[in-house]
Amino acid sequence: MGCAFCASTIGGKVRDLRPSEMLGQLTAAAHDLGERIDGVVMMGIGEPLDNYENTVKFLHLVTSADGLNIGGRHISVSTSGIVPKIYELEKEDLAITLSISLHAANDTRRSALMPVNRKWSIDELLTAAKHYFDATGRRVSIEYTLIAGENDTPADAKELAALLRRYFARGDALHVNLIPVNPVKESGFSKGSRESVERFRENLEQSGITATVRRTLGPDINASCGQLRRASGRA
Protein backbone atom coordinates (compact mmCIF):
# COMPACT_ATOMS: atom_id res chain seq x y z
CA MET A 1 0.00 0.00 0.00
CA GLY A 2 3.06 2.25 -0.10
CA CYS A 3 3.11 3.32 3.57
CA ALA A 4 6.27 5.35 4.11
CA PHE A 5 7.32 3.72 7.40
CA CYS A 6 6.64 0.08 6.53
CA ALA A 7 9.20 -2.55 5.56
CA SER A 8 6.45 -4.72 4.08
CA THR A 9 5.77 -2.33 1.21
CA ILE A 10 9.34 -1.96 -0.06
CA GLY A 11 9.37 -5.16 -2.11
CA GLY A 12 5.99 -4.42 -3.67
CA LYS A 13 3.03 -6.73 -4.13
CA VAL A 14 3.70 -10.16 -5.60
CA ARG A 15 0.19 -11.70 -5.64
CA ASP A 16 -2.87 -12.37 -3.50
CA LEU A 17 -2.96 -15.30 -1.10
CA ARG A 18 -5.67 -17.88 -1.66
CA PRO A 19 -7.92 -19.01 1.24
CA SER A 20 -6.18 -22.40 1.25
CA GLU A 21 -2.80 -20.72 1.70
CA MET A 22 -4.06 -18.64 4.61
CA LEU A 23 -5.50 -21.77 6.20
CA GLY A 24 -2.20 -23.53 5.56
CA GLN A 25 -0.39 -20.96 7.69
CA LEU A 26 -2.70 -21.74 10.61
CA THR A 27 -2.41 -25.50 10.29
CA ALA A 28 1.38 -25.29 9.97
CA ALA A 29 1.58 -23.11 13.09
CA ALA A 30 -0.69 -25.49 15.01
CA HIS A 31 1.47 -28.43 13.94
CA ASP A 32 4.71 -26.70 14.93
CA LEU A 33 3.33 -25.59 18.30
CA GLY A 34 1.54 -28.83 19.03
CA GLU A 35 -1.60 -27.01 20.10
CA ARG A 36 -4.84 -25.63 18.71
CA ILE A 37 -4.82 -22.12 17.25
CA ASP A 38 -7.67 -20.17 18.85
CA GLY A 39 -7.04 -16.65 17.54
CA VAL A 40 -6.23 -14.99 14.22
CA VAL A 41 -4.83 -11.53 13.46
CA MET A 42 -4.78 -10.55 9.79
CA MET A 43 -2.16 -7.85 9.95
CA GLY A 44 1.35 -7.30 8.64
CA ILE A 45 2.42 -7.96 5.06
CA GLY A 46 -0.45 -7.19 2.70
CA GLU A 47 -3.84 -5.46 2.89
CA PRO A 48 -6.62 -7.96 3.71
CA LEU A 49 -9.40 -5.82 2.24
CA ASP A 50 -7.50 -5.45 -1.05
CA ASN A 51 -7.86 -9.25 -1.30
CA TYR A 52 -11.43 -9.09 -0.09
CA GLU A 53 -13.02 -12.16 -1.67
CA ASN A 54 -10.27 -14.53 -0.56
CA THR A 55 -10.06 -12.94 2.88
CA VAL A 56 -13.79 -13.38 3.50
CA LYS A 57 -13.76 -16.98 2.25
CA PHE A 58 -10.95 -17.70 4.68
CA LEU A 59 -12.77 -16.00 7.56
CA HIS A 60 -15.97 -17.96 6.96
CA LEU A 61 -13.92 -21.14 6.81
CA VAL A 62 -12.10 -20.62 10.10
CA THR A 63 -15.21 -19.44 11.97
CA SER A 64 -17.43 -22.25 10.68
CA ALA A 65 -18.25 -25.16 12.97
CA ASP A 66 -17.24 -27.36 10.03
CA GLY A 67 -13.93 -25.51 9.79
CA LEU A 68 -11.66 -24.45 12.64
CA ASN A 69 -14.57 -23.11 14.72
CA ILE A 70 -12.63 -20.05 15.92
CA GLY A 71 -14.94 -17.44 17.45
CA GLY A 72 -15.24 -14.12 15.66
CA ARG A 73 -14.30 -12.32 18.86
CA HIS A 74 -10.86 -13.91 18.59
CA ILE A 75 -10.23 -12.64 15.06
CA SER A 76 -8.96 -9.21 14.01
CA VAL A 77 -8.73 -7.87 10.46
CA SER A 78 -6.60 -4.81 9.82
CA THR A 79 -7.01 -2.29 7.03
CA SER A 80 -5.08 0.77 5.95
CA GLY A 81 -8.37 2.31 4.91
CA ILE A 82 -10.17 0.74 1.94
CA VAL A 83 -13.45 2.34 2.93
CA PRO A 84 -15.97 0.61 0.61
CA LYS A 85 -14.81 -2.81 1.77
CA ILE A 86 -15.41 -1.89 5.42
CA TYR A 87 -19.09 -1.42 4.61
CA GLU A 88 -19.11 -4.78 2.83
CA LEU A 89 -17.37 -6.51 5.73
CA GLU A 90 -19.99 -5.43 8.25
CA LYS A 91 -22.61 -7.34 6.22
CA GLU A 92 -20.70 -10.64 6.34
CA ASP A 93 -22.13 -11.75 9.72
CA LEU A 94 -18.66 -12.47 11.09
CA ALA A 95 -18.61 -10.27 14.23
CA ILE A 96 -14.83 -9.88 14.05
CA THR A 97 -12.72 -6.99 15.33
CA LEU A 98 -11.91 -4.29 12.79
CA SER A 99 -8.46 -2.75 13.18
CA ILE A 100 -7.82 0.62 11.55
CA SER A 101 -4.22 1.48 10.69
CA LEU A 102 -4.47 5.22 11.34
CA HIS A 103 -0.97 6.48 12.27
CA ALA A 104 -1.83 10.19 12.00
CA ALA A 105 -4.60 12.50 13.21
CA ASN A 106 -4.90 14.83 10.21
CA ASP A 107 -5.14 14.31 6.47
CA THR A 108 -2.00 16.23 5.58
CA ARG A 109 0.25 14.06 7.69
CA ARG A 110 -1.58 10.81 6.98
CA SER A 111 -1.48 11.37 3.23
CA ALA A 112 2.29 11.85 3.47
CA LEU A 113 2.67 8.60 5.42
CA MET A 114 -0.07 6.54 3.77
CA PRO A 115 -0.97 7.06 0.08
CA VAL A 116 -4.37 5.37 0.59
CA ASN A 117 -5.47 8.50 2.46
CA ARG A 118 -5.33 10.48 -0.78
CA LYS A 119 -8.27 8.38 -2.00
CA TRP A 120 -10.22 7.97 1.24
CA SER A 121 -9.85 10.66 3.90
CA ILE A 122 -9.70 10.23 7.66
CA ASP A 123 -13.30 11.42 7.88
CA GLU A 124 -14.46 8.78 5.40
CA LEU A 125 -12.42 6.10 7.16
CA LEU A 126 -13.57 6.84 10.70
CA THR A 127 -17.17 7.29 9.56
CA ALA A 128 -17.00 3.77 8.09
CA ALA A 129 -15.36 2.44 11.27
CA LYS A 130 -18.10 3.96 13.42
CA HIS A 131 -20.72 2.46 11.10
CA TYR A 132 -19.03 -0.93 11.53
CA PHE A 133 -19.22 -0.58 15.32
CA ASP A 134 -22.88 0.44 15.20
CA ALA A 135 -23.73 -2.49 12.89
CA THR A 136 -21.77 -5.22 14.68
CA GLY A 137 -21.32 -4.04 18.26
CA ARG A 138 -17.65 -4.99 17.98
CA ARG A 139 -15.12 -2.59 19.45
CA VAL A 140 -12.85 -0.99 16.85
CA SER A 141 -9.09 -1.11 17.29
CA ILE A 142 -7.02 1.89 16.22
CA GLU A 143 -3.40 1.12 15.28
CA TYR A 144 -1.01 4.06 15.67
CA THR A 145 2.70 3.71 14.90
CA LEU A 146 4.76 6.19 16.90
CA ILE A 147 7.49 7.82 14.80
CA ALA A 148 9.96 10.15 16.50
CA GLY A 149 9.45 13.74 15.41
CA GLU A 150 6.58 12.86 13.08
CA ASN A 151 3.50 12.00 15.14
CA ASP A 152 4.59 11.36 18.73
CA THR A 153 4.39 14.69 20.57
CA PRO A 154 1.94 15.58 23.37
CA ALA A 155 0.19 17.86 20.87
CA ASP A 156 -0.19 14.90 18.50
CA ALA A 157 -1.74 12.85 21.32
CA LYS A 158 -4.26 15.59 22.06
CA GLU A 159 -5.11 15.94 18.37
CA LEU A 160 -5.61 12.17 18.09
CA ALA A 161 -7.82 12.04 21.18
CA ALA A 162 -9.99 14.91 19.95
CA LEU A 163 -10.33 13.26 16.54
CA LEU A 164 -11.41 9.90 17.94
CA ARG A 165 -13.89 11.44 20.39
CA ARG A 166 -15.68 13.12 17.49
CA TYR A 167 -16.56 9.74 16.02
CA PHE A 168 -16.67 7.46 19.08
CA ALA A 169 -18.49 9.11 21.96
CA ARG A 170 -18.65 5.86 23.92
CA GLY A 171 -15.41 4.97 25.64
CA ASP A 172 -15.92 1.25 25.07
CA ALA A 173 -16.30 1.65 21.31
CA LEU A 174 -12.61 1.68 20.53
CA HIS A 175 -9.13 0.94 21.81
CA VAL A 176 -5.83 2.43 20.63
CA ASN A 177 -2.76 0.25 20.14
CA LEU A 178 0.45 2.28 20.18
CA ILE A 179 3.31 0.73 18.21
CA PRO A 180 6.86 2.11 18.39
CA VAL A 181 8.06 2.13 14.78
CA ASN A 182 10.39 -0.65 13.67
CA PRO A 183 13.59 0.82 12.21
CA VAL A 184 13.77 0.40 8.43
CA LYS A 185 16.94 1.66 6.77
CA GLU A 186 15.15 2.75 3.61
CA SER A 187 12.60 4.92 5.48
CA GLY A 188 14.92 6.84 7.77
CA PHE A 189 12.30 6.86 10.54
CA SER A 190 13.20 6.10 14.14
CA LYS A 191 11.32 5.44 17.35
CA GLY A 192 11.25 7.74 20.34
CA SER A 193 12.31 6.98 23.87
CA ARG A 194 10.37 4.67 26.14
CA GLU A 195 9.45 7.74 28.19
CA SER A 196 8.00 9.57 25.18
CA VAL A 197 5.94 6.52 24.23
CA GLU A 198 4.54 6.22 27.75
CA ARG A 199 3.83 9.96 27.87
CA PHE A 200 1.83 9.68 24.64
CA ARG A 201 -0.23 6.84 26.12
CA GLU A 202 -0.86 8.81 29.32
CA ASN A 203 -2.03 11.84 27.33
CA LEU A 204 -4.56 9.68 25.51
CA GLU A 205 -5.78 8.09 28.74
CA GLN A 206 -6.18 11.52 30.35
CA SER A 207 -8.36 12.49 27.39
CA GLY A 208 -10.61 9.48 27.90
CA ILE A 209 -9.11 7.22 25.23
CA THR A 210 -8.05 3.72 26.33
CA ALA A 211 -4.61 2.91 24.95
CA THR A 212 -2.00 0.17 25.20
CA VAL A 213 1.62 0.12 24.08
CA ARG A 214 1.96 -2.98 21.98
CA ARG A 215 4.78 -5.34 22.85
CA THR A 216 7.23 -5.53 19.95
CA LEU A 217 8.82 -8.81 18.90
CA GLY A 218 11.73 -9.47 16.58
CA PRO A 219 13.34 -6.08 15.88
CA ASP A 220 16.60 -7.14 17.54
CA ILE A 221 17.09 -9.75 14.80
CA ASN A 222 15.30 -7.80 12.03
CA ALA A 223 12.32 -10.16 12.24
CA SER A 224 9.52 -7.65 12.76
CA CYS A 225 6.79 -7.03 10.19
CA GLY A 226 8.23 -7.23 6.68
CA GLN A 227 11.87 -7.13 7.76
CA LEU A 228 12.72 -10.78 7.08
CA ARG A 229 11.04 -10.58 3.68
CA ARG A 230 13.12 -7.51 2.89
CA ALA A 231 16.33 -9.19 4.05
CA SER A 232 15.53 -12.26 1.94
CA GLY A 233 14.96 -10.06 -1.09
CA ARG A 234 18.39 -8.46 -0.68
CA ALA A 235 20.17 -11.81 -0.23
Regions found by a protein language model. Give the residues of each.
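Canonical Radical SAM [4Fe-4S] cluster-binding loop centered on the CxxxCxxC motif
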Residues: 1-20
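Gly/Ser/Thr-rich beta-alpha loop segments that engage phosphate groups in nucleotides
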Residues: 4, 46-48, 83, 220, ...
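Short, surface-exposed helix/turn micro-motifs that flank interaction/cofactor sites
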Residues: 4-7, 177, 226
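Short, surface-exposed helix-loop/turn micro-motifs enriched in polar/charged residues
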Residues: 13-14, 37, 69, 213
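Conserved AdoMet/S-adenosylmethionine-binding subsite of the radical SAM
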Residues: 21-207
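A structural preference for short, hydrophobic beta-strand core positions in alpha/beta folds
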Residues: 178, 213-215
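Residue-level detector of anion-binding/catalytic polar loops
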Residues: 210
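Radical SAM enzyme core and accessory elements
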Residues: 216-235
